[in-house]
Amino acid sequence: MPSLPPSKREILVFEPDVEGHSQEWLQHLVDFVAANHQAAAIAVLAPPALCATLSRSIPPVADGRIRFIAMKPSEVKLCGHRSLSLAAFARWWTMRRYLQRSGADMGFFLCLDLLSLPLAFGLGTHGKPLAGILFRPSVHYAAFGNYQPGLGEWLRDVRKDLLYRMMLRNPAVAAILSLDPFFPAHAADHYRHGGKVQALPDPAHPAADSAGAVVSADIVPPGRIAFLLFGYLTERKGPLMVLDALRLLPQRVAARVAVLFAGRVDPAIRDAIETRRDVLAREQPDLWLRIDDRRLDRAELDSLVTQSAVILAPYQRFVGSSGVLLWAARAGRPVLAQSFGLVGRLTREHRLGLVADSSDPAKLAAEIERMVDGGPQTFIDLSSAADFASSRTPHRFASAPATSPASPPPGRPATRR
């Protein structure tokens, strides 16, 4: 039976998380579907607060092709369980149940990584095809060069390799969209059904109207070089290593920099940040440091990125891509990023700034000093950065999920489970 054209289908888009990119990426999908009548209709299955926020932004031209389904509190709790295995099976079960209830033609996981476990067991959704976005493949990092995984990372990659291999054999899995542009080639070379893996561009944020932003034009003291770390500040994002590195700066360098942390601080590290902040105040009195512990809107972030000289991305051996690179590239600002993994490779290949072993405060401090002494703009290729950002648009990002294949490849029909 031939597949329905996209405009006659409905895709159930499932996202149980509210932190990170969830709202922003769902907004891209909503905007794309509203503006493109040939795209599939979407039903967004998400926590109530996220549904309420997104529903207020539906353009009038959507013409009933976008609807929202609020998850029950118990479902949100199970899908976010601390046991990742339990959360994975809860997400699969929730998708299976709502696909049947909603009448949607296929299911799409905004984040597929956890689902590799239940899908590797061959679990399906009543014969309806599934697709989703894979954020953190790492099994191909050896091809990046100088990859020396620890035992835990090696075991993680062995586990991922097995799960990916088995997941791709699942006839219910129609497509996997990878935010890592290098993983599809690896999948095609190493997995029997690797052709299901396709590259998906991480979307650069469109420029916001900053007229209403409440960011002062002189937030950074004049004469200082501003370093900005923004987003939801977890330990993995590197704020503690940055504070440790700032202690090691020569006094002459500390007197020339301004460091701003902008974004909600993870409660788990709030005390550690305050302790380091107190130490810095004693040991580096000439250093300017500000921590703005709150969620900032897009216009505020646009303004802060534009005002800053360097954007910090000192992740701690983080696997996957980072929207921070796109914010910086679009604004023409160099990054100081981790050397590890995809973030490091993209920074080097597209000449977006400098990389460092960000798990070592001394090496991070050395690169901060280098950027201050050499001038931040000498470490970015503005033309390459502009090309990097322009090739990763919200439209390109949203068009892939909204036009996902409606059925698995011919010859491998989805079984009913």
Residues covered by each model-derived region:
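A conserved mid-protein helix/loop that constitutes part of the nucleotide-sugar donor-binding site
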Residues: 23-28, 234-248, 271, 326
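Glycosyltransferase donor-sugar binding loop
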Residues: 45-51, 230, 258-274, 290, ...
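Nucleotide-activated donor-binding/catalytic signature segment of Leloir-type glycosyltransferases, i.e.
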Residues: 65, 272-299, 303
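Membrane-proximal helix-turn-helix segments that form the acceptor-binding/catalytic region
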Residues: 93-100, 138-140, 148-176
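Active-site proximal beta-strand in glycosyltransferases
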Residues: 106-109, 122-147
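Conserved donor-binding/catalytic core segment of Leloir-type glycosyltransferases
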Residues: 219-237, 243-246, 259-261
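Acidic donor-binding loop of glycosyltransferase active sites
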Residues: 303-320
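Short hydrophobic beta-strand element within catalytic cores of glycosyltransferases
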Residues: 310-311, 334-338
